Curated annotation (Swiss-Prot):
Pfam families: FtsJ, RlmM_FDX, RLMM_N. It comes from Pseudomonas syringae pv. syringae (strain B728a). Gene3D superfamilies: 3.30.2300.20, 3.30.70.2810, Vaccinia Virus protein VP39. This is Ribosomal RNA large subunit methyltransferase M. Its EC number is 2.1.1.186. The active site is at residue 300. GO terms for molecular function: S-adenosylmethionine-dependent methyltransferase activity. It is an enzyme of class 2 (transferase). PANTHER family: RIBOSOMAL RNA LARGE SUBUNIT METHYLTRANSFERASE M (PTHR37524), RIBOSOMAL RNA METHYLTRANSFERASE FTSJ DOMAIN-CONTAINING PROTEIN (PTHR37524:SF2). One of its GO terms (biological process) is methylation. The gene is rlmM. It is found in: Cytoplasm. Catalyzes the 2'-O-methylation at nucleotide C2498 in 23S rRNA.
Length: 357
């Protein structure tokens, strides 16, 4: 099981290869990354038998930027009939697993396999259980089968607490009909990814204050209002009347890059389409000057060298806070609802909750 298989957004296979190669070098795991364009997946082939396992053990999945999901394992060719017997025979060398996910890659060809997976899962689950290879235990490894076609599957393992929280890393979020734009799902997914669910009541509470830079028409403001927060929406464009009618939103027609609140707030969010370095500077200013405690900001990506640019900006942000003597946690992820962008989450670790006026 010397292959690490990773899902990603189509078109970002090269970024996954660059990123995982960086981490492999850091962990002294020998191997090479490979991918074909627009296949929504990439592989890292380890030269040592335990390389993929060491790579996964040495790297937290939630700290990766571009991979949506990962698993270590091997590819298996399948016959037209009796696929289950072939899979069971190969799984003899695998440990007992605590859960089972059947996955496909995020391409048109992959989506066409979804119905096959739905029909195949029940008999496979039954056979695995009867063979003693599958039990209901979240502490045991997760068995991930990624079907490239009806005749080829990647048999993979991943720890349930060190892999994606959704199959293929694709969240099942429902677009709220009352939200003014689909961008609302980006902020909701960001909260799921960066904030443990059992901390939402504390860190996304209704007694908090927030600022949404570049807010109009209010897709991200909607998420803040839904949590009961007071929101200052900064944008020269119009806000959705439904949000203004809540009484929780103050709309200021101002420049999001120059506005600063009179009093510190709990949250700042920003989805302004601008050069990534300029949006990154907002994070340094707002967190560094104590204007907010937590922030979610999207960084639009260049056409080339996208991983290198993101890495450069994150390093600059981290160095800036170190120079200020400010303690922060920094997270970055290309979310499912992101396109040519990544989402950054920063949290100050040394300031108290803002007082609501």
């Amino acid at each position: 099981m010397n292959t690490l298989f990773m899902h990603c957004r189509p078109g970002f296979e090269g970024e996954v290869c660059s990123e995982i190669a960086d981490h492999a070098a850091r962990l002294d795991v020998a191997g090479y990354a490979k991918a074909r364009p627009d296949t929504a997946c990439a592989e890292f082939i380890c030269t040592e038998a335990d390389g993929a396992e060491r790579l996964m053990n040495g790297q937290r999945f939630d700290k990766l930027i571009f991979p949506r999901q990962w698993a270590r394992g091997l590819f298996l060719e399948l016959p037209e009939t009796d696929r289950i017997s072939v899979i069971l025979a190969q799984l003899a060398a695998f440990p007992i697993c605590g859960s089972l996910w059947l996955e496909v890659v995020d391409t048109n060809d992959g989506k066409e396999l979804s119905n096959f997976c739905k029909k195949f899962e029940a008999p496979l689950r039954k056979a695995l259980t009867q063979a003693g290879k599958l039990v209901d235990d979240p502490r045991k490894p997760r068995l991930l089968l990624t079907f490239k076609s009806g005749r080829e599957v990647f048999l993979g393992l991943a720890d349930a607490d060190n892999s994606a929280m959704w199959p293929m890393g694709i969240p099942r979020l429902k677009f709220p009909r009352e939200a003014p734009s689909r961008s609302t799902l980006k902020l909701e997914e960001a909260w799921h990814h960066f904030i443990p669910r059992d901390q939402w009541d504390e860190r996304l509470s209704g007694d908090m204050t927030s600022v949404d830079l570049g807010a109009a028409p209010g897709g991200w403001t909607y998420q803040l209002v839904r949590r009961g927060m007071l929101v200052t929406a900064i944008d020269n464009g119009p806000m959705a009347e439904s949000l203004m009618d809540t009484g929780l939103v103050q709309h200021l027609m101002a420049d999001g890059f120059t506005y600063k609140p009179r009093q510190p707030v709990d949250w700042m969010v920003c989805d302004i389409v601008e050069k990534p370095a300029r949006n990154a500077a907002l994070l340094e200013t707002w967190l560094g000057e104590g204007l907010c405690r937590e922030a979610v900001v999207n960084l639009k990506l260049p056409m080339k060298q996208r991983y290198a640019e993101v890495r450069r900006l994150l390093d600059r942000i981290e160095e800036g806070f170190q120079a200020r003597g400010v303690r922060v946690s920094i997270g970055c992820k290309q979310l499912y609802h992101d396109r040519e962008e990544v989402t950054c989450h920063l949290r100050r670790l040394d300031v108290a909750k803002a007082a609501r006026k």
